[in-house]
Structures are given as C-alpha cells and as structure tokens.
Amino acid sequence: MSDFAAKWDQDGKRFYEIGVDRGVFYPLSDEGTYENGEAWSGLSNVTNKPEGADVNDVWADNMKYLSIRAAEKFGATIECYSYPDGFKACNGEEEVVPGVTVSGQTRKAFGFSYRSRIGNDIKFQDYGYKIHLIYKATASPVEKSYGTINDSTDVDAMSYDVETTGLEVGTINGIEYRPTSHIEIDSTKVDPALLATFEEIIYGIEGSTTPKMPLPAEVFELFGGSVVPSIEINKHL
C-alpha cells in the first residue's frame, strides 16, 4: 500500500471554531475613521453572510464557453441581548433629552469587531482565536417583541441584519486587492508581539487610549505588509 503524502486526522490538527465574545462597536466619524469604540456586551451570535458572486454562464460554439461570477458583497447578522449606547444612532434612535428617545431617525454607519475561538483535539478551545473586523456597516430595521413574564426564564433577544460597503485595500506586497469590508486575524498565524500591539489598538488601554479600529491598509501594514494604497487611506468615503 502506498504511503500517501496527504495525512488525515493527525493529533493536534483536528481543528474547529466555536464561540463569540469581545464584541466592540466603533462609530464611523465624519473623517472616515473608527474611533471611540465601546465594548459590546451581550453578544449571543454573529453570522457572516457573504452574498452575490452569482454565476453567469456564457455559451459559444454550441457549448458552455465559460462561467463569470458577479461581484461579492459582505453582510452579517448580529444577535444580542443588549447593545452599547453608541449603537442607538445606528439603530435610527436619537436621545432628544436625557432618558427620552425618538426612533425613525437617520441610521448611521459603524464598524464592528468580535472574536471567535479556534479549537483542536489537544488544547480544545484554548488553541487560538480569530478577530473579525467589519467595516462601514449599516443595520436594517428589525421587529422587537415584548412578552408577558411567566413561569419560564426566556429573555428577549435582538437581531440586526447588517449590510456593508467595501473599503479600499490597495496593493500589498505587489498584489492588488479588491475593496473589502471584512478582515480576519488568526492568532495562530501572526506574530504574537504584533497581535498584542493590534489588540491594544482595537480594545484600547485603560486610562490611556480608547478603542480604535484601523482601516484595512493600516491593518495589513501593522502585520508586515508593504502597502501601496490606491487612494489616500483616510479619504475612502
């Protein structure tokens, strides 16, 4: 029997992803930056929903000549039991006077980050994690019901469908990339020192800096990419 180069189910290489935590909300400033982030407690689920990329078959010479795919866009669903005060403006709510809020206002764009765990068969969910960055997102209106209190312990959850607009990435290490609104950072593959610096940026340092989400080109530059932006980094709106 041949000794195959491909190896299946080796110890330490049975990977999976689980969990969601460390959510952070970042309001989009008029200058196109994502600063003054707020911790988003109460996250219960985040679903990434890429859409588009529909296939269009081209026929010639009485046969299928080729397949072309349309552009892809990124969306998500955020499920939670609460949200930070700053998210109210992104939900079409404005506090007119302290404690009194009106709805139906302009929905502002925002940035969002969260963490998912990476597990394996040895370290389980402590093997590593991914940090997800979502840019220039807007939340769609959703219904919210209020039910009577009874002998069950169900808590009313909220769910927000999110659409995004891609930001310029530029040319990195000689390769030109399309605009994106979603980036993942894998803790098991990046330099730990650079990751620590990155986390200080996106989560802030108590008593020193507030959470800030770097723009895509800034993220790649921090982790060692040689970036040539196609337009000025902070002039993407």
Predicted regions and their residues:
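Mixed-charge, glycine-accented linear interaction segment located at domain edges/termini
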Residues: 141-235
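Structured, beta-strand-rich domain cores
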Residues: 64-140
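Polar/acidic, low-complexity leader/linker segments enriched in S/T/G and N/D
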Residues: 1-48
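Oligomerization/assembly interface segments of phage tail-like spikes and tubes
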Residues: 48-50, 59, 63-87, 153-167
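Acidic Ser/Thr/Pro-rich low-complexity disordered segments
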Residues: 33-34, 116-128, 172-181, 188-190
